[in-house]
């Protein structure tokens, strides 16, 4: 079984011989980005860097962010979301497999009318969690206050991006709410559910 990231040939403009680069590097050149892991600072910084580079390279071409993520760090996810709103090109979001927690938050941050879920994708929303480490009582109180601020921020974004009333989002975030692709479309997290006859539209 092959180990590591697969490599593909790529020929630079003006060069006769192709060089081998990893498949993700090749796809980034086509403005196709991937979030296929737990959301942490490292992957967030990578995605932010790529989006900023592509934004500077050509502001007229859309970007496509494919998501299969169980979620992760709240601030890392928010930083990706904010960058998606900052760059000039529209960012399409496509859910493959699972977009849970911060994964669904990033999914809903795609350009409205350009958020897609594949037919068997699953989407989950819930409130941000805290580590509640063993520390001073005052530190725990400060952390709890910060979690409440983050929850308020995330709730307001879901309200804005889905069109759902504040009370609905607040109530649903009290627990893990899983949705099918169609349910996520009805909820407003995505705009379309992809079907085989329109699969080519994901990159066109």
Swiss-Prot record:
Catalytic reactions on record: Hydrolysis of proteins to small peptides in the presence of ATP and magnesium. alpha-casein is the usual test substrate. In the absence of ATP, only oligopeptides shorter than five residues are hydrolyzed (such as succinyl-Leu-Tyr-|-NHMec, and Leu-Tyr-Leu-|-Tyr-Trp, in which cleavage of the -Tyr-|-Leu- and -Tyr-|-Trp bonds also occurs)
One Gene Ontology molecular-function label: serine-type endopeptidase activity
UniProt cross-references to InterPro entries, sorted A to Z: ClpP (IPR001907), ClpP/crotonase-like_dom_sf (IPR029045), ClpP/TepA (IPR023562), ClpP_His_AS (IPR033135), ClpP_Ser_AS (IPR018215)
Localization terms from the record: Plastid, Chloroplast stroma
Highest taxon of source: Eukaryota
GO cellular component: chloroplast stroma; endopeptidase Clp complex
Entry EC no(s): 3.4.21.92
CDD domains the record matches: S14_ClpP_2 (cd07017)
Main location class: plastid
BP-aspect Gene Ontology terms: protein quality control for misfolded or incompletely synthesized proteins
Active site: 101 (nucleophile), 126
Keyword Hydrolase: yes
Protein keywords: Chloroplast, Hydrolase, Plastid, Protease, Serine protease
Family: Belongs to the peptidase S14 family.
Subunit organization: Component of the chloroplastic Clp protease core complex.
Function: Cleaves peptides in various proteins in a process that requires ATP hydrolysis. Has a chymotrypsin-like activity. Plays a major role in the degradation of misfolded proteins.
HAMAP family to which the protein is assigned, alphabetical: ClpP (MF_00444)
Name this protein carries in UniProt: ATP-dependent Clp protease proteolytic subunit
Source organism: Anthoceros angustus
Source species taxonomy: Eukaryota, Viridiplantae, Streptophyta, Embryophyta, Anthocerotophyta
């Amino acid at each position: 079984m092959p180990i590591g990231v697969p490599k593909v040939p790529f020929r630079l403009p003006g060069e006769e011989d192709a060089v081998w680069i990893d498949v993700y590097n090749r796809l980034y050149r086509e403005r196709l980005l991937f979030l296929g892991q737990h959301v942490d600072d490292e992957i967030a910084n990578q995605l932010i860097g790529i989006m900023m580079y592509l934004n500077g390279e050509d502001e007229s071409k859309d970007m496509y962010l494919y998501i299969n993520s169980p979620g992760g760090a709240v601030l890392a996810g928010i930083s990706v979301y904010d960058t998606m709103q900052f760059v000039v090109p529209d960012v399409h979001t496509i859910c493959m497999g699972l977009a849970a927690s911060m994964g669904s938050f990033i999914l809903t941050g795609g350009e409205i009318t350009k958020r897609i879920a594949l037919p068997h994708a699953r989407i989950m929303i819930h409130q941000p969690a805290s580590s509640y480490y063993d520390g001073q009582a005052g530190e725990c109180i400060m952390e709890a206050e910060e979690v409440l601020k983050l929850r308020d921020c995330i709730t307001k974004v879901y309200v804005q991006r889905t069109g759902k009333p504040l009370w609905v989002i607040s109530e649903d975030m009290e627990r893990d709410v899983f949705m099918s692709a169609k349910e996520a479309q009805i909820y407003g997290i995505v705009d379309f559910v992809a079907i085989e006859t329109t699969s080519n539209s994901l990159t066109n």
